[in-house]
UniProtKB/Swiss-Prot annotation:
Family: Belongs to the frog skin active peptide (FSAP) family. Tryptophillin subfamily.
GO cellular component, as recorded: extracellular region
Subcellular location: Secreted
Protein source organism: Pithecopus centralis
Reported tissue expression: Expressed by the skin glands.
Record's protein name: Tryptophyllin-14
Modified residues annotated as Leucine amide in this record: L6
Length: 6
């Protein structure tokens, strides 16, 4: 998943 979902 991309980092902006964290």
């Amino acid at each position: 998943f991309p980092p902006w979902v964290l």
